[in-house]
Amino acid sequence: MRIGVRGHDVEHSSLDSLFGNIHKQGFYCTQLALSKAVKEFKVNNGVMTPGLAFYIRELCIRNNVDVAVLGCYLNLANPNKEQLAKTQNTYKAHIRFASLVGAGMVGTETGAVNEEYSFTPDNHTDEALKTFIEGLIPVVEYAEKMGVTIAIEPVYKHIVCDFKRARKVLDAVNSPNLQLIFDPVNVIYAGNYERQDEIIREAFELCGEDICCMHLKDFVVDNGEVKSVISGRGLLNYPLLMSYVKTYKPFVHCLLEDTKPDNAAEAKHFVEDMYDKAELLC
């Protein structure tokens, strides 16, 4: 397991200090969302030049940190065709950048059927899934040309809300450059949290070969609502999850989420301890 942290969850004043602080905290990798992590200048498609990519790559090498995921979390199901085209171009810019910076993948969530990118029951329809796939295919085709992996992240409130739908997307697009980020908490809600073991097993049974990265946090139930917290402070079955990771994904990038500079070490130590204690499943 290669444990890391999101760049925008680390205290820093510059890209140089960002990667230095990630290394000082004992992390091996990061998820880099440029628009959130870069503080020196505004990030847009034109800013993502080879020069910037090589500079970040140099910082990574100097600090022994991988860019596990280059984040681009936009709406590929936007009903506004003009905005969708702009979004697809932004994904292509991130794909080019990922190929130069040495990122493991470009990560994305799976959108909503409205321009606001908000939850509606319509997100869970077959028509919504078809719309997302249509928006995703040109992006994956470009990723194939550039030798980059696109990784989709299922989220209950979004279009790909579970691993049955994730499997449908993977099969429909049918590309070796399309894989999956697995965040168990993202697909847990008030109606299914008691079946979390089943959800973890289903993810690996349906999509295990395509899981290329893990997002790690925890959850609590407060007044009937599932809320995310840092790893170790909630109800997620980490012994089961880490058994799957240890058995089937031993060196996978595992990125902590929802941490702050003053509690990242706590979450890191908890996850490492759970991994060390995890039993192999076969």
Language model: regions and residue ranges:
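Acidic/histidine-rich catalytic cores of soluble enzymes
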Residues: 2, 30, 70, 133-235
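A short acidic, helix-capping loop that chelates divalent metal ions and anchors anionic groups
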Residues: 38-43, 76-80, 114-122, 188-191, ...
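H/E-rich (His + Asp/Glu) clusters that bind or coordinate divalent metals
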Residues: 234, 239-241, 246-248, 252-255
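Active-site acidic/histidine proton-transfer and metal-coordination neighborhood
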Residues: 17, 54-55, 59-63, 78-180
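N-terminal pre-domain/capping segments
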Residues: 1-103, 175, 179, 272-282
